[in-house]
Amino acid sequence: MGVCGYLFLPWKCLVVVSLRLLFLVPTGVPVRSGDATFPKAMDNVTVRQGESATLRCTIDNRVTRVAWLNRSTILYAGNDKWCLDPRVVLLSNTQTQYSIEIQNVDVYDEGPYTCSVQTDNHPKTSRVHLIVQVSPKIVEISSDISINEGNNISLTCIATGRPEPTVTWRHISPKAVGFVSEDEYLEIQGITREQSGEYECSASNDVAAPVVRRVKVTVNYPPYISEAKGTGVPVGQKGTLQCEASAVPSAEFQWFKDDKRLVEGKKGVKVENRPFLSKLTFFNVSEHDYGNYTCVASNKLGHTNASIMLFGPGAVSEVNNGTSRRAGCIWLLPLLVLHLLLKF
């Protein structure tokens, strides 16, 4: 619907028709727009939604009557306003220019506008097309999603605007490079944990700054232990075993020794669990505490375990000496073989 199309009173509609038939377009005289110099309207006028549009028509002293029309609706005839829309105002009505302004332009104002003049000889018209640009707006976007590793996902981002905006998807991650999709839809087949994080949808059409919204993608996967650190501690000292695991959701930790679970509250022992790390602390190590401990990390998708040693200072020396002895034997083996060959 054009400017004022919904505001006419019945009597004004009748006057509009009469004006057009009687003095703007006399009987038997066709409306023309072929004169290269008179009347002359502007080229196409482009404005953003909410701004004001000025429509100018160049005339001269041959004009006896003049009017601005939106399609078949008269907005102004001379100094008289035939449109009740308060946004439409007369800017100038002189011997050289006839101009109106449409304030707070909206998309329904877009379309053709006609400057129609009457001279002593015949009527003439000139047209200008009003183009209304609209800033981009994201009207629909996927919600945050949680999905198991290996499954497929589809993200949607629908945007409106004039001209039609360009939609792009980008993975917000230090490892991500450039855009992952230049479309409203982002499809990821067999998603991996490295593809988790935030995905940014951007809509742009050069009318205003791009609009941006984000979707958080959580990729669930079973635990894996990235570090299992044993320690050597003398009797009577404090010792700590550490178990670090990566998992989504975060892993739950348990400690075992000889198939027996160690629980919080045991005298002299403390279990400290964090989202990705568990510590087993002995405040006063005894000979009985030495040995092999098992760290178990689990979540709803699976579990894993690792063996961690708590040993005394002497055990470190024995391990190193044992390694050296094995290396020495390997080094001597070729000499023994050569000696036997020469002997026989």
UniProtKB/Swiss-Prot annotation:
<dbReference type="InterPro" id="IPR013151">
    <property type="entry name" value="Immunoglobulin_dom"/>
</dbReference>
<feature type="glycosylation site" description="N-linked (GlcNAc...) asparagine">
    <location>
        <position position="292"/>
    </location>
</feature>
<keyword id="KW-0130">Cell adhesion</keyword>
<keyword id="KW-0677">Repeat</keyword>
<keyword id="KW-0449">Lipoprotein</keyword>
<feature type="glycosylation site" description="N-linked (GlcNAc...) asparagine">
    <location>
        <position position="44"/>
    </location>
</feature>
<dbReference type="InterPro" id="IPR003599">
    <property type="entry name" value="Ig_sub"/>
</dbReference>
<dbReference type="GO" id="GO:0098552">
    <property type="term" value="C:side of membrane"/>
</dbReference>
<dbReference type="InterPro" id="IPR013098">
    <property type="entry name" value="Ig_I-set"/>
</dbReference>
<feature type="domain" description="Ig-like C2-type 3">
    <location>
        <begin position="222"/>
        <end position="309"/>
    </location>
</feature>
<dbReference type="InterPro" id="IPR050876">
    <property type="entry name" value="IgLON_domain"/>
</dbReference>
<feature type="glycosylation site" description="N-linked (GlcNAc...) asparagine">
    <location>
        <position position="305"/>
    </location>
</feature>
<feature type="disulfide bond">
    <location>
        <begin position="57"/>
        <end position="115"/>
    </location>
</feature>
<keyword id="KW-0472">Membrane</keyword>
<keyword id="KW-0732">Signal</keyword>
<dbReference type="Pfam" id="PF00047">
    <property type="entry name" value="ig"/>
</dbReference>
<feature type="lipid moiety-binding region" description="GPI-anchor amidated asparagine; alternate">
    <location>
        <position position="321"/>
    </location>
</feature>
<dbReference type="InterPro" id="IPR003598">
    <property type="entry name" value="Ig_sub2"/>
</dbReference>
<dbReference type="InterPro" id="IPR036179">
    <property type="entry name" value="Ig-like_dom_sf"/>
</dbReference>
<keyword id="KW-0393">Immunoglobulin domain</keyword>
<feature type="glycosylation site" description="N-linked (GlcNAc...) asparagine">
    <location>
        <position position="284"/>
    </location>
</feature>
<dbReference type="Pfam" id="PF07679">
    <property type="entry name" value="I-set"/>
</dbReference>
<feature type="disulfide bond">
    <location>
        <begin position="157"/>
        <end position="201"/>
    </location>
</feature>
<feature type="glycosylation site" description="N-linked (GlcNAc...) asparagine">
    <location>
        <position position="152"/>
    </location>
</feature>
<dbReference type="InterPro" id="IPR013783">
    <property type="entry name" value="Ig-like_fold"/>
</dbReference>
<feature type="glycosylation site" description="N-linked (GlcNAc...) asparagine; alternate">
    <location>
        <position position="321"/>
    </location>
</feature>
<feature type="disulfide bond">
    <location>
        <begin position="243"/>
        <end position="295"/>
    </location>
</feature>
<protein>
    <recommendedName>
        <fullName>Neurotrimin</fullName>
    </recommendedName>
</protein>
<dbReference type="InterPro" id="IPR007110">
    <property type="entry name" value="Ig-like_dom"/>
</dbReference>
<dbReference type="GO" id="GO:0007155">
    <property type="term" value="P:cell adhesion"/>
</dbReference>
<feature type="glycosylation site" description="N-linked (GlcNAc...) asparagine">
    <location>
        <position position="70"/>
    </location>
</feature>
<keyword id="KW-1003">Cell membrane</keyword>
<comment type="function">
    <text>Neural cell adhesion molecule.</text>
</comment>
<keyword id="KW-0336">GPI-anchor</keyword>
<feature type="domain" description="Ig-like C2-type 2">
    <location>
        <begin position="136"/>
        <end position="218"/>
    </location>
</feature>
<feature type="domain" description="Ig-like C2-type 1">
    <location>
        <begin position="39"/>
        <end position="126"/>
    </location>
</feature>
<feature type="signal peptide">
    <location>
        <begin position="1"/>
        <end position="33"/>
    </location>
</feature>
<feature type="propeptide" description="Removed in mature form">
    <location>
        <begin position="322"/>
        <end position="344"/>
    </location>
</feature>
<dbReference type="Pfam" id="PF13927">
    <property type="entry name" value="Ig_3"/>
</dbReference>
<comment type="similarity">
    <text>Belongs to the immunoglobulin superfamily. IgLON family.</text>
</comment>
<dbReference type="GO" id="GO:0005886">
    <property type="term" value="C:plasma membrane"/>
</dbReference>
<keyword id="KW-0325">Glycoprotein</keyword>
